[in-house]
C-alpha cells in the first residue's frame, strides 16, 4: 500500500498543539481593518483552537503529524 500524502494546504494553515488540538489563525484579518476598532483588531491576533469536529477532519489531512 502506498504512503499517504499530507495535504500541503493543511500543513501551511494548521498546527497541532501538544495536547492534540488543531490550532488555526483567527479569521477576518485580511482586509477591511479600517472600520474595526483597535480592540477588535487586537482580539484577532494569535491562534485559536478549532472545534473538535472540524479538527478531526483536518487531522485526517495530515496523517503523519506527530501529535495527530
UniProtKB/Swiss-Prot annotation:
Respond yes or no to whether keyword Ribonucleoprotein is given for this record: yes
One of its Pfam families is Ribosomal_L35p
Q: Which UniProt keywords apply?
A: Ribonucleoprotein, Ribosomal protein
Q: Which GO terms describe its biological process?
A: translation
Mention any one GO cellular component term assigned to this protein in its UniProt record: cytosolic large ribosomal subunit
Any GO molecular function: structural constituent of ribosome
| HAMAP family with a match to the protein in the record | Ribosomal_bL35 (MF_00514)
The similarity annotation says: Belongs to the bacterial ribosomal protein bL35 family.
- Could you identify this protein by its name? Large ribosomal subunit protein bL35
Q: Which organism is it from?
A: Pelagibacter ubique (strain HTCC1062)
Amino acid at each position: 500500500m502506498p504512503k499517504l500524502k499530507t495535504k500541503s494546504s493543511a500543513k501551511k494553515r494548521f498546527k497541532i498543539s501538544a495536547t492534540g488540538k488543531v490550532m488555526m489563525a483567527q479569521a477576518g484579518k485580511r482586509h477591511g481593518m479600517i472600520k474595526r476598532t483597535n480592540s477588535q483588531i487586537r482580539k484577532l491576533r494569535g491562534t485559536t483552537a478549532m472545534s473538535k469536529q472540524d479538527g478531526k477532519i483536518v487531522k485526517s489531512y495530515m496523517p503523519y503529524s506527530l501529535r495527530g
